[in-house]
C-alpha cells in the first residue's frame, strides 16, 4: 500500500543519508 511504499522510500533515504554522513567523499 501507500504507507508501505513511503516507509520503504524513507528507509532507503535515511540509510543513504547516514552512509553519506558517515563516509563523506
From Swiss-Prot:
Record localization: Secreted
GO cellular component: extracellular region
Principal place of residence: secreted
Tissue/organ expression: Skin.
Family: Belongs to the gastrin/cholecystokinin family.
Protein name as it appears in the record: Antimicrobial peptide 3
GO BP terms in the entry: defense response to Gram-negative bacterium; defense response to Gram-positive bacterium
UniProt function note: Has antibacterial activity against Gram-positive bacterium S.aureus and Gram-negative bacterium E.coli, when in combination with XT1 and XT6.
Secreted as UniProt keyword: yes
Alphabetical UniProt keywords: Amphibian defense peptide, Antibiotic, Antimicrobial, Secreted
Amino acid at each position: 500500500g501507500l504507507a508501505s511504499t513511503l516507509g520503504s522510500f524513507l528507509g532507503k533515504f535515511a540509510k543513504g543519508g547516514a552512509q553519506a554522513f558517515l563516509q563523506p567523499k
